[in-house]
């Protein structure tokens, strides 16, 4: 038996070596986990953030992101070499969307389509480098993945990142600088007409990038007005667009207003509703993007929408982008 064993040992050793070549790189790579987005129990507060938004890993490691919110997000890495890629629209992707799992080394774009709670996406990083992570839906939602050579020590464990993600989530969702209750009307609105604040939010940064709290609610008492009066909606959200939509939602692109919307002299959009069966869509109202040195300044955006109600009734409306998160309201019109 002993002689048979040694006669076969060279072949046996060769098989061991081959198996080691295949298995050891996989065994050496680590699997890391992070999350995308977070939300309050009623979905009214949305954390537009990668949690955590800064991770150190080794080359060959993978990260799996789990989507934890009803608001749409993407996990996207844009190409950086040989030249930096222009930022695409979230609906276009790289163009196109990546298979899962994906590989990223900076030479070609990787992006998910817009995803929501329950989805996951995994990326393997085969080469060392510092790679910016972005959400193509939300400009102020960024992060960074530091991919180190195998010889370099990692500063943190998965436990650290789990704790950091929980702490960042609590900090964003419990932000007390803003109140999203029914009495939280801002003092900057001076009109005597009914006022509704559309959304709200706050952008914060840390060494890893930017995160945003977004309030997916119409803030303020349900307007109670008389026939012939006007209600004005004004956006306080620094990041997300919203709509004010009465009746049937428009088919197709929700960006433009419906055909029965006009523009006032101050740039606000305006519509007249004569019946509870009328359909009116504001189109997107949103804050203008931040100006940047060396680029043409951003044009003014549409931040207000007004509706004049000619007849009594109760008029329900929604944000066509975020109604599934509970962003709904109504206007009560008395004689």
Put a short name on every predicted segment:
Residues 10, 16, 288-290:
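Prokaryotic Sec-type signal peptides and long signal-anchor helices
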Residues 7, 26-30:
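Extreme N-terminus of proteins, especially the signal/transit-peptide cleavage junction
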Residues 1-11:
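N-terminal secretory signal peptides that target proteins for export/translocation
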Residues 14-25:
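Bacterial N-terminal signal peptides
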Residues 29-335:
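Extracytoplasmic copper-binding redox domains, predominantly the cupredoxin/blue-copper superfamily
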């Amino acid at each position: 038996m002993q002689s048979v064993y040694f006669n076969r040992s060279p072949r046996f050793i060769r098989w061991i070596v081959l198996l080691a070549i295949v298995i050891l790189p996989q065994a050496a790579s680590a699997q890391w986990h992070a999350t995308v987005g977070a939300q309050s129990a009623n979905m009214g507060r949305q954390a537009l953030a990668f949690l955590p938004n800064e991770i150190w890993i080794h080359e060959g490691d993978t990260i799996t992101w789990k989507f934890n919110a009803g608001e749409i997000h993407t996990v996207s890495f844009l190409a950086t070499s040989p030249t930096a890629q222009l930022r695409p629209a979230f609906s276009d992707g790289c163009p196109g969307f990546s298979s899962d799992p994906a590989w990223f080394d900076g030479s070609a774009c990787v992006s998910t389509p817009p995803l929501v709670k329950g989805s996951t996406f995994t990326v393997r990083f085969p080469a060392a480098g510092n790679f910016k992570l972005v959400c193509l839906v939300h400009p102020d939602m960024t992060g960074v993945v530091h991919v180190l050579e195998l010889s370099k020590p990692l500063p943190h464990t998965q436990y650290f990142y789990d704790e950091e993600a929980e702490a960042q989530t609590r900090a964003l969702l419990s932000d007390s600088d803003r109140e999203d209750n029914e009495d939280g009307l801002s003092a900057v609105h001076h009109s005597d007409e009914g006022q509704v604040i559309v959304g709200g939010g706050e952008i914060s940064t840390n060494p890893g990038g930017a995160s945003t709290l977004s309030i997916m609610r119409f803030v303020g008492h349900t307007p109670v007005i008389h026939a012939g009066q006007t209600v004005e909606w004004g956006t306080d959200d620094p990041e997300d667009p919203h709509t004010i939509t009465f009746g049937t939602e428009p088919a197709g692109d929700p960006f433009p207003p419906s055909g029965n919307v006009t523009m006032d002299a101050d740039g606000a959009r305006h519509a007249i509703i004569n019946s509870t069966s009328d359909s009116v869509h504001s189109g997107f109202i949103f804050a203008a993007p931040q100006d940047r040195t060396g680029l043409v300044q951003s044009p003014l955006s549409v931040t207000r929408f007004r509706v004049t109600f000619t007849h009594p009734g109760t008029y329900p409306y929604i944000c066509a982008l975020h109604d599934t998160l509970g962003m709904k309201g109504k206007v009560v019109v008395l004689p």
